[in-house]
Amino acid sequence: MKGSSLSLEIAEPYAQALMSVSQSNNLTERFGEDIRSLLDLLNNSPELREFLSNPVIREENKKEILQRIMGDQTHPYLRNFLMLLVDKRRIAFLEQVCEQYLALLRQLTNTVLAEVVSATELNDEQRQSVIDKVKTISGAQAVELKASINPDLIGGVIIKIGSQILDASIRGQLRRISLSLGGV
């Protein structure tokens, strides 16, 4: 269901409502931080994702788990929003709602999401270099990096900004050389 048009259709109004609440209370960044933490948790815990999306599990149990996970650090408006998702039986779309909220937040703050794949983990200097390059290409004020590692790249990076892909990997360079030699 992840990424389907139906889930987007369901998630979008909830994300917009959450954005509206966060803007009217000047909490957009705070909600963004909490939502990023929640997404990390969902991505690292398939059990939690399955628990929340399981229709057999009672709403009270889902609320209790969410209360424990979110704790007192999370703003009450966001906690109440999560309880609303449970009540409306939309908690299965939590991941999509969170992703959509972050997309709206990036749009609001003129931030682009750059997905970076590298052969090894990027150090701070390399991360900053990628951020600077993405800012130049996109004209955005800020860049949110989503980094992953793929040792098959041998070296270099692949940067994806929206639908644009920049392949500066050694594997990509070797492939381009191979194609050009094959055409000779």
Swiss-Prot record:
InterPro entries in the cross-refs: ATP_synth_OSCP/delta_N_sf (IPR026015), ATPase_OSCP/d_CS (IPR020781), ATPase_OSCP/dsu (IPR000711)
Pfam families documented for this protein: OSCP (PF00213)
Protein's UniProt keywords contain Transport: yes
SUPFAM superfamilies (UniProt xref): N-terminal domain of the delta subunit of the F1F0-ATP synthase
Top-rank lineage group of the source organism: Bacteria
GO cellular component, one term: plasma membrane-derived thylakoid membrane
Assembly, per entry: F-type ATPases have 2 components, F(1) - the catalytic core - and F(0) - the membrane proton channel. F(1) has five subunits: alpha(3), beta(3), gamma(1), delta(1), epsilon(1). CF(0) has four main subunits: a(1), b(1), b'(1) and c(10-14). The alpha and beta chains form an alternating ring which encloses part of the gamma chain. F(1) is attached to F(0) by a central stalk formed by the gamma and epsilon chains, while a peripheral stalk is formed by the delta, b and b' chains.
Known role: F(1)F(0) ATP synthase produces ATP from ADP in the presence of a proton or sodium gradient. F-type ATPases consist of two structural domains, F(1) containing the extramembraneous catalytic core and F(0) containing the membrane proton channel, linked together by a central stalk and a peripheral stalk. During catalysis, ATP synthesis in the catalytic domain of F(1) is coupled via a rotary mechanism of the central stalk subunits to proton translocation. This protein is part of the stalk that links CF(0) to CF(1). It either transmits conformational changes from CF(0) to CF(1) or is implicated in proton conduction.
Protein name: ATP synthase subunit delta
Organism encoding this protein: Gloeothece citriformis (strain PCC 7424)
Gene designation per UniProt: atpH
